[in-house]
């Protein structure tokens, strides 16, 4: 690794304007996440031309895919945190070793998930109540996606490592390039052309698999040649007990956190479906809008994790605290503004996704009016969660997720919708109430962080002295 590159990137994040540093990291991450959502939009566009069964096949597969991905996402959280702290502490060799260890673990972890997912796919689809006419399409799509999860995990880990080192432009460019390729390959593999056979709905999965493979190889080459201040050495891929323990200790709670959200979403869907088709459709529309709205908050959360991690590693605890506070305030203001603007135009926004469906628009507009003003509270939580992860407090974010989903939101939604006169409105009210309570709880935990005891590099067998700028 070039120490000059590492020093330049790290110094830019350890000094000067915090706001400029947040924008420098956050904006490219936001753009990359928006592009990543383009995969889903492109697949939906072309698969939609195969008919409703093909569209339903992708829809019913998404919860399973999300759950499988959740099982491995903790490794990327651990990678970002440990690399950021090592870079901030000028422990460049250890940053390289962490990168190699996390990438290796992601590959090893993905293999049993891919094998189990392939053989359990029929059972999981039946468990979700997949209709018989949709089942063969869903099975072919799901098996291809699950079989190639090694590439999805691989690129996810590599871009997380780069972000931990402060490099966000290259993952953005790789995502943009593979998105363009996916847009070209989707119609070719779905409908066939010349010697290329028509794979139908499975063609969309094959295109995604190929492009994720290309993205992983590109990311690996970037890190192999040390172009971003971080370098993966193949000789460092042999598991090291202390590093593996640190990665698992940080990563496991993060995986449980995401699984809690995934299962919580399924639990909410169970409540919603019992209230009628129109309510279910309205819920689905608003939840999809929510997923798009929180993209800026995801970017701020990742930027916060990178900046806080590097500053904690460098021993700049007060700057790290200031980063968390400013990031939380910015996320709150931006998402609050988005929510309030959305309220004004909510009937038109909901109507775009549910044209000529007045009851869906009515329910969706009411739901949106209640949840949108609380978007800022979601942004605040996500930003501070980035600070928790950067200081190794993934257990805190896990507990907050479990409390939010299973002790507050779902019981509240059930009670208000079934045992009060609110009815359907009770379901909607559960969201802003939960957001308010969890924002307060998150702030309380953040203000109790002991910043002087947030360094994790000692657990890796690191020397207490800074390593020379050579690797």
Task: For the regions a language model picked out, list residue spans one by one.
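Short alpha-helical transmembrane segments in multi-pass integral membrane proteins
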Residues: 1-26, 83-150, 196-252, 308-374, ...
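Short runs within selected transmembrane alpha-helices of multi-pass transporters and secretion channels
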Residues: 76, 145-163, 171-182, 204-217, ...
């Amino acid at each position: 690794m070039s120490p000059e590159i590492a020093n330049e990137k790290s110094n830019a994040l350890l000094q000067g304007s915090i706001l400029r540093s947040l924008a420098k990291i956050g904006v490219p991450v936001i753009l990359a996440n928006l592009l990543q959502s383009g995969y889903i939009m492109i697949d939906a566009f072309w698969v939609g031309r195969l008919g409703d069964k093909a569209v339903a096949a992708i829809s019913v597969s998404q919860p399973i895919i999300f759950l499988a991905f959740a099982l491995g996402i903790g490794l990327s959280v651990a990678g970002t945190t440990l690399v950021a702290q090592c870079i901030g502490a000028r422990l460049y060799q250890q940053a390289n070793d962490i990168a190699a260890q996390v990438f290796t673990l992601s590959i090893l972890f993905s293999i049993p998930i891919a094998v189990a997912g392939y053989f359990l796919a029929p059972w999981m689809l039946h468990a979700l109540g997949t209709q018989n006419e949709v089942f063969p399409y869903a099975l072919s799509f799901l098996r291809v996606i699950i079989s190639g999860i090694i590439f999805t995990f691989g690129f996810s880990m590599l871009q997380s490592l780069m972000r931990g080192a402060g490099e966000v432009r290259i993952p953005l460019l790789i995502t943009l390039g593979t998105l363009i390729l996916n847009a070209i390959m989707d119609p070719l593999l779905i409908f066939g052309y010349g010697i290329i056979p028509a794979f139908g709905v499975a063609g969309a999965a094959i295109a995604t698999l190929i492009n994720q493979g290309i993205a992983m190889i590109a990311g690996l080459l970037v890190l192999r040649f040390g172009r971003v201040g971080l370098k993966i050495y193949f000789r460092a891929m042999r598991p090291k007990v202390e590093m593996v323990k640190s990665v698992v200790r940080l990563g496991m709670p993060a995986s449980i956190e995401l699984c809690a959200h995934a299962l919580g979403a399924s639990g909410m869907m169970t409540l919603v479906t019992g209230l009628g088709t129109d309510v279910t459709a309205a819920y689905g529309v608003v939840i999809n809008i929510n997923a798009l709205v929180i993209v800026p908050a995801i970017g701020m959360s990742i930027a916060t994790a990178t900046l806080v991690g590097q500053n904690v590693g460098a021993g700049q605890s007060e700057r790290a605290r200031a980063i968390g506070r400013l990031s939380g305030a910015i996320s709150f203001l931006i998402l609050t503004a988005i929510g309030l603007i959305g309220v004004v135009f909510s009937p038109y926004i909901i109507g775009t996704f549910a044209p000529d469906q007045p009851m869906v628009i009515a329910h969706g507009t009411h739901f949106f009016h209640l949840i949108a003003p609380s978007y800022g509270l979601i942004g605040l939580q996500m930003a501070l969660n980035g600070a928790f992860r950067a200081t190794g407090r993934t257990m805190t974010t896990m507990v907050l997720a479990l409390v939010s989903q299973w002790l507050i939101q779902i019981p509240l939604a059930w009670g208000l919708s079934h045992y009060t006169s609110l009815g359907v409105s009770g379901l909607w009210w559960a969201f802003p109430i939960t957001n308010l309570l969890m924002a307060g709880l998150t702030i309380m935990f953040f203000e109790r962080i002991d910043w002087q005891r947030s360094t994790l590099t000692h657990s890796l067998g690191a020397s207490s002295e800074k390593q020379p700028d050579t690797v």
